[in-house]
Structure formats: structure tokens, C-alpha cells
Swiss-Prot record:
Gene: MRPL38
Family annotation (SUPFAM superfamilies): PEBP-like
Protein name per its UniProtKB record: Large ribosomal subunit protein mL38
Transit peptide boundaries: 1-26
Subcellular location: Mitochondrion
Family, per entry: Belongs to the phosphatidylethanolamine-binding protein family. Mitochondrion-specific ribosomal protein mL38 subfamily.
Record keywords, A-Z: Coiled coil, Mitochondrion, Ribonucleoprotein, Ribosomal protein, Transit peptide
Top-level taxon of the source organism: Eukaryota
Database matches in PANTHER family: LARGE RIBOSOMAL SUBUNIT PROTEIN ML38, PHOSPHATIDYLETHANOLAMINE-BINDING PROTEIN
Gene Ontology CC entries for this record: mitochondrial inner membrane; mitochondrial large ribosomal subunit
Amino acid sequence: MAAPWWRVVLNGSRNWRGFSTSAALSRRAAPLGPMPNEDIDVSNLERLKKYRSFDRYRRRAEREARDPHWWRTYREHFGEESDPKDTVDIGLPPPKVCRTQQLLERKRVLRELRTSVEEERASRLRTASIPLEAVRAEWERTCGPYHKQRLAEYYGLYRDLFHGATFVPRVPLHVAYAIGEDDLVPVYYGNEVTPTEAAQPPEVTYEADEGSMWTLLLTNLDGHLLEPDAEYVHWLVTNIPGSRVAEGEETCPYLPPFPARGSGFHRFAFLLFKQDKPVDFSGDTRPSPCYQLAQRTFHTFDFYKKHQDAMTPAGLAFFQCRWDDSVTHIFHQLLDMREPVFEFVRPPPYHPKQKCFPHRQPLRYLDRYRDSHEPTYGFY
């Protein structure tokens, strides 16, 4: 005979396992401003204004997205708050250019090109040639310094050299390494130069007024073997009269790049400082020759902080360099030390906990958990 229904319910309720949770309700605070769509009367949606066009809706949505709100979006909440106005500019002031005169000059050049019969004929016959040297000179004079600044920020030069302070390289700095008698390897803004090509001091040229004083620095930002935040100074020429680098005081003799094997690309930066007056750099002088790495330990930030009242960064050029066979000769013959070799040790691959019965797994499943690299079931 079946038990009464109330007995079944009673016995079932006694054996029922209750549900519990450790979650707690958070206290809801009043919003800091009006919430989205709180002015809409949801009880009568028919009276709402109809857009009747997707274009109207899109324009209204874009206008609403551009309007300031009291809440922060996802990008604003997780994005880095970096205001370019907060950075310190330690460079030369921008040149004073009359915008009206500049526009008039451009219009004059366009008018001459449009009225020139020779230019029209060369363009029609596709025989026109563009003077690249003039184009580069115009680029250096107008937007080139700002492009160089963006490249230096991308490579982290300002962050590592001046602790975040920035400057616009107003003075074009041209650096080239001589290979043989005729070939030159130029240094631009991040190109690769091998240690073999940079074995000898480069040719450095720039435009300078007669009577001005300059300082030229070559430093390795990534090559220090003991201190992660230190640099190696490879060349330092101070009190340069005008653009005659050979007549300056070689405070630190030139040392070829020696990026250690396995350490990847190193950043080498040429910095040109403009001096207000002759400066005494006796405290920064290194012996000649200088093959002790401890004596070449350098901090550009401390060097500039020490002489910031008398000089201003004005020019910049940098290249990337990695190991080749000539670095071994530098370590053994010049530095008289054993060559360090680095290797990137990859982390071990992650494998989940081994199952006792790996259902529907391939045969090589067991190879993941063996100490040796020999396959369990041969080659397959």
C-alpha cells in the first residue's frame, strides 16, 4: 500500500539538503550623476520620439558619445593617464617663424611651378626629377625634428636617458662610419650598424654658428654587464668650436661597440649638446686609452644634471647594434677579459596533471610526463 502523500512530503523535506552561500549583498550608494536613459518613461514607449532613419540615430549616438559624462568608459578606466603637457622640455626653444610669410612663400612656389612650361612638359613626358637633397633639407627644416622626437620616444631613449624629460632635436646631426675609402654607413634613427662597421670613430657633421661651443656624446643604453640602469660611454668630445669635431677636447676616447653575444640589439645614441660657454669637464675625463669598463660606467641623466646650467641637448641620432665576430676580438684584445655569452632560457612548458586513465588521448600523451626526450612508442 502506498504511503500517504503528506508522509512522503514530510520525509522528503527532512532528507532535503539546504542551499547556502557565502556571498553578501554589497551596499548600493547613490550615483554621482544622472544615469543613462533615466529620463525615459518606460510605461508609455509609444510616445517616444522616432528617428525614422538609421543616419539620424547614428549621428545622435555619436554626438552623445562625444559629450562629457560623469562616468568613465572602459578605455578611460584602464588606459594610461599621460598628459603630454606634464612632460618637461629640456631642449632648445622653437625658432620664431612667421606663418604668414611661410604661406606666401609656398603660394609663390606653387605659382611658379604651375606657370613653368618646362616643368609642365617634364611632368607630361614623365621625365621630371625631384631633388632629394632639397626635399631632405626642407624636411629637416620643418617637420623632421618632431618626427625624430616621436622615434626617440618609441625606442624609449628619453625615458632611459633623461628619466622622462624630452626635447626636440632642432639641430640636424649627421653621423656616418667610413668603410674603406669610398663607402659610408650612415646613422639615422634606429637603423642597424654592425660592430665591424663601427670599429673606427665616425664622421660627425652639423650646422653651427662660428664661436659656438658643443659637446658630443656616444653612449650604450643596454650594454652594462653589472648594473641594469647604467650605461657605457663610448665617446665624449667636449668644448667643440663650431662644427669642427676634430678640434674638440676628447674627454673620453672612442671605443667600438661590444654588445655581448646573446643579449640582442643594443641602443647606441649620439647626443649633441649646445654649450653657452666653455665648460670644465675635468671631472668626466677618462684616461687614454681607457679599456677598463668600470671607468666607462656612465649615467647621462647625472652628466646632464651636473652641467645643465651651461649646456642644452640640441641634436640626436641613434642606431641599433648586435653581436658579430669582431666583438670577440674587442673583449680578448682590448678589454683583456673573457667574453660573456648569454642565452635565453625559456620557461618549461605547462602540462596539466597527468591522468591515470587518459581517455581518448593520443599515444604521445605519455611523452609529456617523461624525464627523457626519447619517444615512448618510437617515431610516429
